[in-house]
């Protein structure tokens, strides 16, 4: 870095620094060679790898239809939230592989992955998804068990006599 010798040189440097701060980050479309957007989603111990591509609205999870993989309607609703919020129900085919955790964590991980992949495919959807809270990683995990306790917080039964 060059040394600054006068106030005019200092003002030039500070003015350029201020303009860089005011510029909003430009989000560009991120696609692979096959025209798909890829993202990973996480929730609890589950990790989902999600690809989206233009299609008819078919959702495949671990090579199964999503309503076969997630039998409970609540889990299917969780998974479809970002697609419904952006009105892209029938525009994209979604392929996901998910591992780890239970079904609830896996549904949350796929939802997170779908949201991120949608922003990579259509960056203008970012504001809708951000407002809905779909792009935020849910960091809540199981609290660890402590020694001297029955569970994380539950104490052993206390007997006075």
From Swiss-Prot:
HAMAP family documented for this protein: Ribosomal_uS9_B (MF_00532_B)
Molecular function per GO: RNA binding; structural constituent of ribosome
InterPro entries: Ribosomal_Su5_D2-typ_SF, Ribosomal_uS9, Ribosomal_uS9_bac/plastid, Ribosomal_uS9_CS, Ribsml_uS5_D2-typ_fold_subgr
GO cellular component, one term: cytosolic small ribosomal subunit
GO BP terms, alphabetized: translation
Keyword vocabulary terms for this entry: Ribonucleoprotein, Ribosomal protein
Gene3D superfamilies: 3.30.230.10
Top-level lineage group: Bacteria
Name this protein carries in UniProt: Small ribosomal subunit protein uS9
Pfam family, one: Ribosomal_S9
Family: Belongs to the universal ribosomal protein uS9 family.
